[in-house]
A protein has these predicted regions:
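Compositionally biased terminal segments of proteins
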Residues: 1-252
Length: 252
């Protein structure tokens, strides 16, 4: 794949400009394992001029010198400041950190410039990343947070169609990594009813999580009242027991 074929699109154009500036300043080469919307563009599963505004990659953070260059490019090409970033929703940023949450990820070479090598996540790895992102977001919802991953649903459905993978396949692929028991059912709900169906299901899950918290809190309060006595209550009970024993002794 030749990146110059896509040079008219802002993100591709910006990568070329970054490479040229790194070459001019003699900055050592970097290798980027790309995920997210940019990876889907490379896989031709999104229009190259869609609403993707950044390039997500897995790996060490960029040097400050490279960040300064990307900031300059963002102004020139009207991009967001952090258009090239490793700020993923999952814990950590290195490949090892991410794989701790997703299992093994695979990247294939996409294109290489003089100072920048781009590897792209395979379609199966993209499914893993997006399903775990939804799983993480649903866990936050259970903790009274807001759900923020609606854009991933359509991508997952399209990736499943492209790869031929079903829900059982994904369940096996991510066995031991999916935390929330509702993750796959929520994705199924999107495929069936769209965003509206997911919003309703999430509201029901939030209500269920709240009910469970109330039950737990009520149980803790009951347990506290049942087993943890105040010093006053303890003294009162001891006095009553003592008096009862004295009464029984006197009645003999």
């Amino acid at each position: 794949m030749d990146i110059n074929d896509f040079a008219k699109y802002p993100l591709y154009k910006s990568i070329i400009e970054l490479n040229e500036e790194m070459e001019r300043r003699n900055i050592p080469p970097i290798e980027l394992n790309v995920v997210g919307g940019f990876a889907l563009m490379i896989h031709k599963m999104r229009n190259r001029n869609d609403n993707s505004t950044d390039i997500d990659f897995v790996g060490p953070s960029l040097s400050q010198e490279i960040k300064n260059i990307t900031n300059e490019i963002s102004i020139r090409n009207n991009l967001v400041k952090d258009w090239l970033n490793n700020d993923l929703m999952l814990t950590g940023s290195t490949l090892e950190d991410i794989e701790f949450s997703t299992g093994r990820l695979t990247f294939n070479p996409a294109f290489e410039l003089s100072r920048i090598k781009i590897n792209v996540a395979t379609l199966e790895s993209m499914i893993k990343l997006k399903v775990i992102a939804i799983d993480t977001a649903l866990t936050a919802v259970d903790n009274s947070g807001d759900f923020s991953r609606y854009k991933d649903f359509a991508d997952i459905i399209n990736l499943m169609k492209k790869t031929g993978l079903g829900y059982d396949d994904i369940g096996k692929m991510l066995d031991g990594y999916i935390i929330n028991p509702n993750t796959l059912s929520v994705i199924k709900e999107y495929e069936k009813s769209g965003r509206e169906g997911v919003e309703i299901k999430i509201l029901l899950l939030q209500r269920e999580a709240l009910d469970n918290k109330i039950k737990i809190m009520s149980g803790e309060a009951l347990e506290s009242k049942t087993y943890v006595r105040s010093s006053f209550t303890e003294d009162l009970l001891n006095n009553l027991i003592t008096k009862s024993k004295e009464k029984n002794y006197d009645s003999r």
